[in-house]
């Protein structure tokens, strides 16, 4: 990535790289070097009438310029997964609404993923009213999509990843300010990350059983939109009082988390979401907020983040925060207006929908998704 920045700064069309000058294991270094260069080169320009032609020639010489085939396959899969995530996040809201998003996931069947799409009729039958309530003000449909990858011959428990897919978030009746609302196309970044991950696992034929679950909605004001004060019943059977329709991501995740735990009985669940602005106040764009009910899983995610540069910082969960989301009229409310701790109370809310003590972690990635840097 740094070398790519160097290239952009110097604006030369051709570079020569001598692999013999590298002291580290070149078979490890070269693959990562080229992978980082490719990731940094990503541009989303499909709506530009005139596209820049920034072709650079990089010649690798020396006796240590080979990359093992298995590493080539792995890096290519990682690249395609990451680029697919970026493409989804970069699409404008008028293009990638929930109907279109769900359709785009169907071709993933061709690479070995089992795709199942639950439309509003199926979701209503299942009782996923917290998810459905978020999208009821939109003319677009709401969906839950499951993506299964079976890389092991046995029936071992899968790893589960759940993503928030609010394709555009106006805030609903609790309308957001106009300034920067255009960035709310990124409010589906958690779901896009899960989709990219599942695509990468399938392309590299990963030896693991995994499932990705994404809730796809559009949060719009309208004659049928959810109102502050509404009470809805979740898939879990727990009821939620909606105090603010702009605290909608947790409502989408609530049904998705319970369904994932109940249907797949996974080893663990990791959910990813642009859930709160409060996490940006706390951590900026350098760290994702990590909340977990399991120390082992938390440590694994922290270690993985340090190795890859995708850093996380563990934040607190504690029963003492429960009073901030308890409701007088329902089992809980979707936001608290006093007491602060916005990111923690959001995670505390999600934890209530993990019913069987499954190891679970919540990654609040708002800082990364909305970063301008």
Regions found by a protein language model. Give the residues of each.
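A generic structural signal for tightly packed, nonpolar segments enriched in small/aliphatic residues
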Residues: 12, 85, 99-373
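Short amphipathic alpha-helical segment within the helicase RecA-like ATPase core
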Residues: 1-165
């Amino acid at each position: 990535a740094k070398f790519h920045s160097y290239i952009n700064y110097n604006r030369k069309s051709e570079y020569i790289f001598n692999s013999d000058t590298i002291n580290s294991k070149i078979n490890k270094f070269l693959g990562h070097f080229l992978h980082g260069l490719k990731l940094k080169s990503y541009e989303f320009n499909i709506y530009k009438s005139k596209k820049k032609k920034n072709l650079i020639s990089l010649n690798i010489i020396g006796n240590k310029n080979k990359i093992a085939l298995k590493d080539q396959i792995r890096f290519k899969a990682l690249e395609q997964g990451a680029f697919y995530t970026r493409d989804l996040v970069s699409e404008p809201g008028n293009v990638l609404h929930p109907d279109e998003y769900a359709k785009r996931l169907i071709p993933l069947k061709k690479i070995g993923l089992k795709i199942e799409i639950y439309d509003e009729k199926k979701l209503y039958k299942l009782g996923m009213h917290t998810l459905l309530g978020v999208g009821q003000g939109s003319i677009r449909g709401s969906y839950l999509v499951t993506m299964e990858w079976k890389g092991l011959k046995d029936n071992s428990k899968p790893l589960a990843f759940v993503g928030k897919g609010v394709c555009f978030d106006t805030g609903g009746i609790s309308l957001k300010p106009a300034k920067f609302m255009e960035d709310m196309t990124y409010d589906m970044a958690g779901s896009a990350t899960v989709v990219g991950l599942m695509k990468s696992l399938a392309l590299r034929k990963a030896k693991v059983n995994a499932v990705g679950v994404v809730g796809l909605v559009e949060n719009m004001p309208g004659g049928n939109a959810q109102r502050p004060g509404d009470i809805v019943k979740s898939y879990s059977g727990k009821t939620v009082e909606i105090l603010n329709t702009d605290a909608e991501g947790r409502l989408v995740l609530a049904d998705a988390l319970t369904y994932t735990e109940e249907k797949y009985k996974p080893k663990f669940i990791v959910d990813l979401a642009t859930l709160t602005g409060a996490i940006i106040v706390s951590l900026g764009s350098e760290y994702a907020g990590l909340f977990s009910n399991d120390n082992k899983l938390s440590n694994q995610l922290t270690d993985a983040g340090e190795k890859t540069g995708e850093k996380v910082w563990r934040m607190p969960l504690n029963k003492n925060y429960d009073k901030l989301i308890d409701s007088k009229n329902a089992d809980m409310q979707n936001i608290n207006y006093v007491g602060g701790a916005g990111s923690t109370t959001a995670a505390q809310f999600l934890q209530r929908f993990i019913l069987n003590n499954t190891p679970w972690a919540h990654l609040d990635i708002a800082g990364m998704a909305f970063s301008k840097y």
